[in-house]
Amino acid sequence: MGFTGFPDEAFVFYEGLEADNSKTYFTRHKHFYDDAVRAPMIALTDALAGEFGEAQLFRPYRDVRFSKDKSPYKTHQGAFVDLTPGIGLYVQLDASGLYTAGGVYTQASDQVARYRAAVDEDISGKPLEKIVDELRAAGYTIDGDRLKTRPRGIPEDHPRLDLLRHRSLYAGRRFDPEPWIHTPEVLTRVRETWHAYAPLLTWLTTHVRSSDHPHR
């Protein structure tokens, strides 16, 4: 069955899970998760796979081993298209609506070093600055893990100091749960944003590349 949109029950399910993040709630409402969240997300990513690649759906369970927050379930459903290990495209559904992103969410130490070296050099740093400026101008957010201070060895007046602070970098756009979210128009919205991330992804895969080192 093709993608037809996300039903109201998906948002009701996550609103309830935010209020009661417990095994009892999840077990009692698991049919809503299966039918209104997981199945439509699979249909959505399957419809986009021919153009962007196969997506991995994340499990609904949180890893709480090293977290102070022991809530057992994620309050969103995400899916990721891995273009180069760690660099790719993302789509997420939660009680607040739909979110898409593209970039690198975590980087190993060698990737951070390559990223900063490329940003530092005008020949590669200026194109990234232009990509980021154009994404912001088009209404996308630019996010990622950032240092509060400047990296060691970088002068205070570096023209790309803000980008150099990043340890990860991705662009994103959030959509409120408007009526179109219940229709196949979701495909168009996700496709448009994923195409918009292409220049950033190309820059990252060219200059950062994948890593065999442990991620931070």
Segments the model singles out, each with a brief description of its role:
Residues 28-33, 104-105, 115-119, 182-186:
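Short histidine-centered catalytic/ligand-binding loop motif
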Residues 10-11, 15-60:
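Active-site acidic/histidine clusters and adjacent loop/turn architecture
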